Amino acid sequence: MRRAYFVAIALLVAAGGKTAAGFKHNEPLHASSSNFMASVDTVDEDLQSQNLQESRDPKDDLKLSAGNEERTPSALNNFLKEPKLLESIITAGKAMRTEGEANAIEAASKNLNQIESNKRQRIALTHNAVAGHRGHPSPDSDKSLMSVANENPLMLAESLKDQRPTAIMENAASLLKEHDYRLAPPESSTINDKAPDGRLKNQVVTQKAVQLDKNEHVDESFWREELVSVDQLMRLLDEFDKSAHPTTVNRHEESASAVALKSSNQLESITHQRIAPTSNNVIGQVAHAPSNNVIGQVAHAPSNNVIGQVAHAPSSLSPVLVAKNIPSILADRLMKKRPTAIMKNAARYLTQHINRPAPSGPSTNGATTSNGGLNNQLTSQKTFQLDQNKHVGDVKTFWLPTAVDRQSVPEDWADEVAKGPDTFSNDAVNDEVKRVHAAFLEALNLPFHQYPQETAMMLRMVRWKKNAGPNNDITSALFKTLAKDHEEVLRLQDLLGPDLKKLLGDGKMALPRNLKNLQEALIVKLVIMYDLFFRFCYKHEDFVGDLPHNPSPASWILKL
């Protein structure tokens, strides 16, 4: 606008110079319109009283003097320095008679009036140098503007006693310069909870905080500004401080606690016992004995019943531990240079069998014992993982019922003895043998089938005063002799019927069922079963009775 005004003045000066010579100053001509002189007077008044505002165009040559009063061009007095020049312009204007020149002056006057009516709000003063980003006026005229200092990073570094600004300080200063929605606080204090009109003051935060509150996409890198209240901002920051790594929660899926509750209900009747720690040579698969023995439950049986006479049967047993190097131990006891395929098959089955305990009654889901505790049923290794709260959702694979093919106490002792091997003459199946045999079967879920005459032979061996240990060569030689006495393949197959697949293998990898392999399989089975029977007897020495003092063997296959 001011450029147009000065252009009009320049035109007036040029026109006045041409017409001044032809007209006299004291003889004004009669204009066709009386409004021309009024327009010149208006221009004169505006030149003397108009206060120019700050120019937004940095190319303007006029400099503004800052102060509490309205700003005026400092070079205006120099521009209109000589009164004679102003009088010559007015005189020349009065002498103009053309309608076009009058319209130009009238347009310049209107422009000055428009500048006067559109005065902008003065800019607030700052103590520091203001950055190039000028604050925009707020729609609310009662709220003052906030200016941003150029040296914000340096001031932050000085406040935190750092030598130079860090990257975080630079980012904060950059955000302050780019932010156009900040409201200056009414005082030097921090942000108030309530504004004068009772509404919450809004502070700009990012969508990141809102997503953190919802626990959604906490690691995404995009940002979006959104207005939230101060109270909500404080709550979000408190929640962030409580948990530096919030956990993503899927509300559409079932929680882990609900799954664990279902698992507990499903396993309520088949609760498991925690697996006992083992030594270095133990694979960690154990067998738990039932907390109450079935033999103890038949104390009121008739006196002629053999089982009814075992009122003092062992009530509990320690877990059965399985050694890692079973093939090597078997090779040493049988004087072999290296383990055979049958020894490896037997060791593989022992590690997979886990020797689950016998159930407390006809039902696999036992009730409570006499002391009020639950009957513990050993399940697979998956149950141990459930106890550690691992994979709580895979409930279907966490439990296995007690083996239904477990060997039980024979109802017809004569028939069971007839199916067994031909032992020595001094290994008769008497009442004592039946008592120990029944307790042995009920206390443990045996890996291989045990005949009563085999128990009779082992009971005689364990009572030897010398050379009774499982690692003794004499015991192994006795088992070899028993196996060599059976020279018929069909007879050996009948004896090993329940255990043929365990020892000789199954399918395409099965060993041929010839006499040599069948005899070796019987020897390996007897060696393993005697190792377990020896420790059973010394674990319950009072129940078995008449046992000599023998030190515990150094090497073992199964251990209580």
From Swiss-Prot:
Point to the regions of Polar residues compositional bias.
Answer: 361-377
> Any idea where this protein resides?
Secreted; Host nucleus
Keywords of the record, alphabetical order, are:
Host nucleus, Secreted, Signal, Virulence
Q: Name one GO cellular component term.
A: extracellular region
- Motif range (RxLR-dEER): 56-71
Disulphide linkage map: none
Q: Where is this region: Disordered?
A: 48-73, 354-377
Write out the biased-composition intervals (Basic and acidic residues): 54-72
Q: Which first-to-last residue range defines the signal peptide?
A: 1-22
- The organism's superkingdom is given as Eukaryota
Q: What is its main location?
A: secreted
User: Which family, according to UniProt?
Assistant: Belongs to the RxLR effector family.
Tell me, what does this protein do in biology?
A: Secreted effector that completely suppresses the host cell death induced by cell death-inducing proteins.
Domain remark in the UniProt entry: The RxLR-dEER motif acts to carry the protein into the host cell cytoplasm through binding to cell surface phosphatidylinositol-3-phosphate.
Q: What is this protein called?
A: Secreted RxLR effector protein 142
* Species for this entry: Plasmopara viticola
Question: What's the name of its gene?
Answer: RXLR142
